[in-house]
Amino acid sequence: MTLIHMNILMAFSMSLVGLLMYRSHLMSALLCLEGMMLSLFVLATLTILSSHFTLANMMPIILLVFAACEAAIGLALLVMVSNTYGTDYVQNLNLLQC
């Protein structure tokens, strides 16, 4: 495993630790999820380029599409929670049920 792969895996694990530590605020959780998705994108791109696996060239693009959808839904949820309750606590998400 090269140094670049180890750095990317460390970035992913630090984002995961940040998600576990700062899970009370929705904005912090969304930022950690974005860090995880970006490190997965870079890792997938490097793996595909180094292995010359041409059939999986679209996988990083699909991963970015899912990351953009996750970010849009997360930001919409953040706006709804902050407009309704004035804070971005994750515990307020249980109160949004019908």
UniProtKB/Swiss-Prot annotation:
It comes from the Eukaryota. It catalyses: a ubiquinone + NADH + 5 H(+)(in) = a ubiquinol + NAD(+) + 4 H(+)(out). It is a multi-pass membrane protein. Keywords: Electron transport, Membrane, Mitochondrion, Mitochondrion inner membrane, NAD, Respiratory chain, Translocase, Transmembrane, Transmembrane helix, Transport, Ubiquinone. Pfam families: Oxidored_q2. InterPro entries: NADH_UbQ_OxRdtase_chain4L/K (IPR001133), NUOK/Mnh_C1-like (IPR039428). It is an enzyme of class 7 (translocase). GO terms for molecular function: NADH dehydrogenase (ubiquinone) activity. It is found in: Mitochondrion inner membrane. One of its GO terms (cellular component) is mitochondrial inner membrane. The chain crosses the membrane at residues 1-21, 29-49, 61-81. One of its GO terms (biological process) is ATP synthesis coupled electron transport. Core subunit of respiratory chain NADH dehydrogenase (Complex I) which is composed of 45 different subunits. Belongs to the complex I subunit 4L family. Core subunit of the mitochondrial membrane respiratory chain NADH dehydrogenase (Complex I) which catalyzes electron transfer from NADH through the respiratory chain, using ubiquinone as an electron acceptor. Part of the enzyme membrane arm which is embedded in the lipid bilayer and involved in proton translocation. This is NADH-ubiquinone oxidoreductase chain 4L.
